[in-house]
Amino acid sequence: MSQTRDLQGGKAFGLLKAQQEERLDEINKQFLDDPKYSSDEDLPSKLEGFKEKYMEFDLNGNGDIDIMSLKRMLEKLGVPKTHLELKKLIGEVSSGSGETFSYPDFLRMMLGKRSAILKMILMYEEKAREKEKPTGPPAKKAISELP
């Protein structure tokens, strides 16, 4: 009955995310060295931003975004999609299996000329973050501003 409980689950998750970040950094270096993408402006900062987005939705750290992760991402952005639409989107992006897409697939899609829906999704997410509600009491209005 003496079971040992790991009370440091957050520490293990942090280590998992650190390992994932190292793997993604190696892939970013390959893209930085690739002459195909050398003409892109501000490539290092773009790759860093894409890495952060990818890590946000690859919660299990296995290196692939699956249908449920993509569904969660789209719902978070207020653009829910059906299961069939998600399968079609992943099939468009993925170079391997039809159920997931990897980080290199994600980068090729984002940096490629035929950027699809996910590029628009990331753009809309950035716009949504800019519109934060003002905090504190509302500003006083003059009588002329009242309806």
Curated annotation (Swiss-Prot):
Subcellular location: Cytoplasm, Cytoskeleton; Cell projection, Ruffle membrane; Cell projection, Phagocytic cup
Annotated positions of the N6-acetyllysine modification: K11
Residue numbers carrying Phosphoserine: S39
PROSITE patterns to which the protein is assigned, alphabetical: EF_HAND_2
Keyword entries, A-Z: Acetylation, Actin-binding, Calcium, Cell membrane, Cell projection, Cytoplasm, Cytoskeleton, Membrane, Metal-binding, Phosphoprotein, Repeat
Tissue: Detected in T-lymphocytes and peripheral blood mononuclear cells.
N-acetylserine: modified positions: S2
Region Disordered: start-end pairs: 128-147
Positions of Ca(2+) 2 binding: T100, D105
Keyword Repeat (UniProt): yes
A Pfam family of this chain: AIF-1
Binding sites annotated in the UniProt record for Ca(2+) 1: D58, N60, N62, D64
Membrane topology: Peripheral membrane protein
Residues covered by the EF-hand domain: 45-80, 81-115
Biological process according to GO: actin crosslink formation; actin filament bundle assembly; actin filament polymerization; cellular response to oxidative stress; cellular response to type II interferon; inflammatory response; microglial cell activation; negative regulation of smooth muscle cell chemotaxis
Signal peptide: none
Assembly: Homodimer (Potential). Monomer. Interacts with LCP1.
Protein's UniProt name: Allograft inflammatory factor 1
